């Protein structure tokens, strides 16, 4: 008679890892100073990717398309044309 000795070794099936579970940190983009607010020269008005809003009077544009004030004054959001928006800074007249 045949005598079979069957032994099962301890084993664990390979378990795949999830492909989810990551997230990038937020970039904190958007409008930082709104229409009618007073700003000082150098203040960041809008942080953006691409020129969603274009620079107007007394507004500079950084290399990353950030818009900032070149003079002290009041923020004013306007239409550049039918499709485009712009932001300008109008200096406040100082009463003496």
Swiss-Prot record:
It comes from the Bacteria. One of its GO terms (cellular component) is cytosolic large ribosomal subunit. Keywords: Ribonucleoprotein, Ribosomal protein. The N-terminus is cleaved by ribosomal processing cysteine protease Prp. GO terms for molecular function: structural constituent of ribosome. Residues 1-9 form a propeptide. One of its GO terms (biological process) is translation. The keyword Ribosomal protein applies. Transmembrane segments: none annotated. Belongs to the bacterial ribosomal protein bL27 family. This is Large ribosomal subunit protein bL27. It comes from Clostridioides difficile (strain 630) (Peptoclostridium difficile). The lineage of its organism: Bacteria, Bacillati, Bacillota, Clostridia, Peptostreptococcales.
């Amino acid at each position: 008679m045949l005598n079979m000795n069957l032994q099962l070794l301890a084993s664990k099936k390979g378990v795949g890892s999830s492909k989810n579970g990551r997230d990038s940190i937020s970039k904190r983009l958007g409008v930082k100073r709104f229409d009618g607010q007073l700003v000082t020269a150098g203040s960041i008005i809008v942080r953006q990717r691409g020129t969603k809003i274009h620079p107007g009077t007394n507004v500079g544009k950084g290399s990353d398309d950030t818009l900032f004030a070149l003079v002290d004054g009041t923020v004013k959001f306007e239409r550049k044309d039918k499709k485009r928006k712009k932001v300008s800074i109008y200096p406040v007249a100082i009463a003496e």
